[in-house]
Amino acid sequence: MVRTKADCAGSSSGSYRKAVAARAPRKTFGSSSSGSNHDTSPTGKKSECKYAGGNPVCVRPIPTWQKGIGDFFGSPSTSQPEKENRIPSDDEEAGGSGAGKKPRKSRPLPPDPSEEAADSGDE
């Protein structure tokens, strides 16, 4: 049998080194002695990120039919309450999935001719 480095991993005589994950270097904004001036730019205005969002290469106009993100994340007080969270009215059943369906009247099943023949044959 041939021994490999994987076989010798448990022994201390092999020249096996455990893989260690490396860390990426941290970005430093200015010098470490800058103090509390790191939150504002030298001009006094709040600096904006160069790539704040969207496509920086080809800026395209937003179509008129596109909804804003506020429509999706609006506060619940401005939007209508959801159907699951409101109390059902008198004409609407709780848990019913059919909106506008008329309730069906229950009626007995018509007698099955094969059962009648079996019942009369036994007597």
Curated annotation (Swiss-Prot):
Q: What is this protein called?
A: PCNA-associated factor
Q: Which domain of life is it from?
A: Eukaryota
Give the UniProt keywords, A-Z: Cytoplasm, DNA damage, DNA repair, Nucleus
Motif annotated as D-box, chain positions: 26-37
> Which segment of this protein is annotated as the motif KEN box?
83-85
Q: Which InterPro entries match?
A: PCNA-AF (IPR040444), PCNA-AF_dom (IPR031444)
**Gene Ontology cellular component?**
nucleus; perinuclear region of cytoplasm
